[in-house]
Amino acid sequence: MRQYIFEKHYPSLSYIANNWPRSKHLLKKFVLSNQKKPDFYEICTKCLNDLNIFKIRDYSSILKKLSKLCSYNFTYNSYHDQHHFKSVILIACLLAKLSKLKSNDDKILLVIIALTHDLNHQGRRVINKPYYQEEKSFKDLSYVIFKKITYKKYYRIKKIFRSTFFPVKPSHVNDHLEKIILDADVLASLMFGIKTGMKFASRLKHEIRFDDKADILFRGFLKLLDSKSLYLDSSKKSC
């Protein structure tokens, strides 16, 4: 049976989800690949197709514009770059399938938030102020989508962006969409083993000019995660 692929030699998200966790190695290969610049519009639309969303109407132009914005890396980040965005999109959409996200509107919002949650990330230049980057990324996103969404959706998205501030455990996380995004943001460093987690920690070490070894940075990440924990059963079972 022909599979709908992300790119040559990669099976569809549906195939990966239907064969999970035996198919984890397929997702890992695509998530870790950083030789080729991602085509975000293609990845996002194919993920939406796999979530049974084939018509995005008013969101098509928005997604094209956001895909272009997210393709830039003006601050030369080695962790919060296009490949981090790519991994969060794919893992978020996988979790949406595994945890049975039902609303079509939520599926579209999921892809938009996963793509842009670290939009224009400042990397080592980020101001040491809680929620600074999260609010900046949301502000940059809001310039694009403000006229297309309701106030209710606007504040819902804003809450999710603020919740991605990793050092603080967000309160009252009851939103299925929010749970998916929060788990997807960190799962790439957890679900593929310690060696992969260390590889991402090394990228982050270089980005923020961390003075100590990458394994110390990774252990600090795991310690913080202990106090936060993953939200979805499908996320926990994937590790």
Question: What do these predicted regions represent?
Answer:
Residues 85, 92, 109-110, 133-171, ...:
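Histidine- and acidic-residue-rich, metal-dependent catalytic cores
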Residues 2-44, 78-86, 91-104, 116, ...:
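Divalent metal-dependent phosphate-bond-processing catalytic cores, especially two-metal-ion Mg2+/Mn2+ enzymes
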Residues 80, 102-111, 129, 149-153:
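Short, surface-exposed helix-loop/turn micro-motifs enriched in polar/charged residues
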Residues 38-72:
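Short alpha-helical hairpin
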Residues 62-70, 110-116, 157-165, 180-184:
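Short alpha-helical scaffolding segments that buttress acidic/His motifs in well-ordered protein cores
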Residues 125-131:
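Metal-dependent catalytic cores of enzymes that make or break cyclic nucleotides
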